[in-house]
Structures are given as structure tokens and as C-alpha cells.
Amino acid sequence: MANPLLLDIVLYLQSVNLVEGDGVDAFRDFTPDMPDQVVLLKEYVGSPAVPYDTMVNRSVQIKVRSKYADTARALALQIYKALYSDTTIVNFTSERWGQVHLRQPPFKVEVDKNDRILYGFNIGVSTTIE
């Protein structure tokens, strides 16, 4: 069985040196209190599967949190650019590729209760169901 999509995205970000690793500074469907600087990935409602296509359209929000707005924005922009491809195809791992649709550039999402700033963006990923 394949890895979950969010884990494959984290592994890809690790391979391009934008995160240290899953559960270190990148978290899936979980927001830890510490460390201050983290990358957060969450999958939300995508589009329904169609009977004639083996691919499904999934939606992912990627957020970067930091004590410094410039740092959060810069890392969010680096991740955004790492997911950009002229063909829209990104090879997350040797077992998973996806057609990535960048829905908007990074924007300021919120300031949390500890005055840390979050920048984020949303992507659509056409990939396998697993």
C-alpha cells in the first residue's frame, strides 16, 4: 500500500531541503504548540472520483508558521515554487507523482494566540486514491 498523500508531500519537501522531516518541522493534520517554525499540511474536501478515470482530485492546504512574518512568507514561497512545474507534474516520491494545481500564491492566513504568523496556500493534486 502507498504512503498517505500528505506524507509523500512531506518526503518531497524533505528531498528538496525545505523541511527536516515528518514530525520534526513538518506536520500532517496536526498543529503542535512547538517548535515555533513549522510547515503544516492538511487535506480537505476534493472533487468526487469519476468512473472512467483512475485519478482523483484532492485538495491540500500548506501553511508555514514562524515568529517572523518575513520568514513564514519566504518559506511558504519557496515551497510554492518547489511545487511549480511547467508540466504541472511533480514526482513526490519514486512511487507517487501528481498533477499539482497551485490555486493561489502564499497569503497571510492568521496570527496565532502566541503571536506567530502563518502564511499558506492551497493546491489541488490529481493523483491516485491511496
Predicted feature locations:
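Short glycine-rich, basic-tinged beta-strand/loop micro-motifs
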Residues: 53-66
